[in-house]
Every structure is written in C-alpha cells, then in structure tokens.
Amino acid sequence: MATSAPVTSRTETLAKYLKLDQKGQIMAEYVWVDAAGETRSKSRTLPEKDYKAEDLPVWNFDGSSTNQAPGDNSDVYLRPCAVYPDPFRGSPNIIVLAECWNAGGTPNKFNFRHDCVKVMDTYAEDEPWFGLEQEYTLLGPDNRPYGWPTGGFPAPQGEYYCGVGTGKVVQRDIVEAHYKACLYAGIQISGTNAEVMPAQWEYQVGPCLGIEMGDQLWVSRFFLARITEEFGAKVSLHPKPIAGDWNGAGLHSNFSTKAMREEGGMKVIEEALKKLEPHHAECIAEYGEDNELRLTGRHETGSIDSFSWGVANRGTSIRAPRETAAKGYGYFEDRRPASNADPYRVTKALLQFSLA
C-alpha cells in the first residue's frame, strides 16, 4: 500500500522573502468558513493603508468547489466583517474574516454569523460575555494521535493533564507558536494547557463581548490549522477521536450577562438555567457533530439525553464554578458543545435560550 511522507514547510528558507519590501502594497488573506465547518482562505493584493472591515472590497470564490453553491451558479461573495494583523507575513499584512453571501443578496446556507449578529444585537443591553475553551487533538501522518505507539496505546490517562516532560506531552512547539500568533493578531487568548488524553490540548479565548467571540475563535482555528501545516502535523476537532477509555474533546462555553456579574447574580444564573433546560434538545442540535460519542455521562461529561447542572460538577450539562456560588455572582459553563461546534451557533443558542 502506498504511503506518503510527512511534508513540512521550509520556513527557514521562506524567512528571507518575508523581509522583502512590498512597495506600498499589502497582502490580505481572506478567511471564511466552508460547508464542512472548516476554514478556507485566499490572498489578494491591496494598497497599503489602515483598513477597517467596511473599507475592504467584497470578493468572491468558487462555491461549487467548497459545497457552498451549485456549479451553474457558483459565485459566493465574501463580505469582510473583521480584520486582524497577519502573524504569518507580519505587518502591514492582514487577515480578513469574511461572511459568505449568495449572488442574490441572501446569506449563504452555511453563514451562521448572520443570524448570530441579530441575536447579539437583540440582547446587546445585557452585555453578554463569552469565553470558549477549544480542545483539539494533534495527529501524525498515520492519523493517530501524535506520539502514540504504532499499533498500541500509551499509558492510561492520569499523568497527561497539564503535564510537563517527555512522555507526558507532545508538540508543545505547536502550542507555543499558536499562542504567540494569537497574541500578535489581537485575539483575546487567555491561556492554554495540555489536556487529559495524550496529544490533546486546549486553549481558551475570551472573555469576548457578543459577536467578537465567534469571530475570534474562528480566526484562532484558522491560525491553528496554518501552524500545524508548517509543522507537518494535523489538527482534529472530532469530539471523540479515539474510542474507549479516553476523554473526548469539547468546546466548553462560559457565559454571563451584566446582571449575572453583579451582586445577586447567582439568582439570575439559576433563572437562566431554568429557561435553558426545556431547550436541551435544541441546544444539542446546535452544539456540533458526533457529540453523542462524547456526551455519555463518563469522562467528565453529562448525558446527551438529559439536562443537569451543579456547582463544581464536571459530570453535568452545566457547571457553576465554586467561586461563582461562593461570591453569589459570576458566570456559568455550558459543557455540552463539542470541539467541532460552530461558535456562532453555540453563542447564539446560549444567549437566546437563557434569556428569552
């Protein structure tokens, strides 16, 4: 059977070209979300200036090649919605996050940002804050978790979470590169750590206000995909990449409103959870693919079939941190979203169903 050798970028050779004068031009990398819930991108040259999203030109791409449009009407338009410094090419080059729109002026079927903005605007006075914990698994050329023995398994879980040292963690260089790239670009990345399963990591983004949460998480995912590309690794957002007695991967979603963060906020949180409970099935439908493999009631998850909450309990649908309960105000954590969930869909559902 044919096999392919891992391919890594020659970044040391590329470095000398990145220093060349651009003659008053910049490179703008337009990034969008495709039909499979993954990022795509392409570049264009623009005159050098300080750009805001509204200053940037609308562009287009072949939607028939991304399963976002039919071949006989394939143009999908890219409408810029957020701009970030480019950590790969450096200043003055930019990353442009764009929404996908159809030729007829309607949002593309896979443009979940559009409806999310509407909900965020509806509840803007509540000042919704979000913080998302993105778990992911690094894979090698054989599509097995990086560093796992060929044809076998590592030692059982227990020594890997926040681990330090050879045999406990792998590919920390990818994690560090991603952390610095996010900071450079202005992503509100708040931390990172090794997770319970070997080759699994997590980073946190937030707190972010409203729509900025989804925007920043999608750009951070794009950065992660680009960085693993350079290191010859793959990143998986599958919520249960390895069957058996191994933790899955989630997108734990921390949420609060202004009223929850003030004195007496715990009562507001409890009322919000009462409103969330009857919408459990609707939330699960928005919270990612293959989540039934992860939400089993084991491995620090609640059951996919029922809604539950508790203080400092990681085996429930919703966890109220011990500190929040002790102070009487703060935030809560929705532990149901899968690692591959769309942050626009998650934050929209969480805000809409907890306040409606």
Curated annotation (Swiss-Prot):
The protein's name: Glutamine synthetase
SMART domains: Gln-synt_C
UniProt-listed GO biological process terms: glutamine biosynthetic process
Organism from which the protein derives: Fusarium solani subsp. phaseoli
Assigned protein family: Belongs to the glutamine synthetase family.
Keywords annotated in UniProt: ATP-binding, Cytoplasm, Ligase, Nucleotide-binding
Complex and partners: Homooctamer.
Domain GS beta-grasp: 26-105
Subcellular location: Cytoplasm
GO molecular function: ATP binding; glutamine synthetase activity
Domain GS catalytic: 112-356
UniProt-listed PROSITE patterns: GLNA_1 (PS00180), GLNA_ATP (PS00181), GS_BETA_GRASP (PS51986), GS_CATALYTIC (PS51987)
One Pfam family from the record: Gln-synt_N
Transmembrane residue ranges: none
InterPro entries: Gln_synt_N (IPR008147), Gln_synt_N_sf (IPR036651), Gln_synth/guanido_kin_cat_dom (IPR014746), Gln_synth_cat_dom (IPR008146), Gln_synth_gly_rich_site (IPR027303), Gln_synth_N_conserv_site (IPR027302), Glutamine_Synthetase (IPR050292)
GO cellular component: cytoplasm
Keyword set includes tRNA processing: no
Catalyses which reaction(s): L-glutamate + NH4(+) + ATP = L-glutamine + ADP + phosphate + H(+)
Protein EC: 6.3.1.2
Enzyme class of the recorded protein, top EC level: ligase
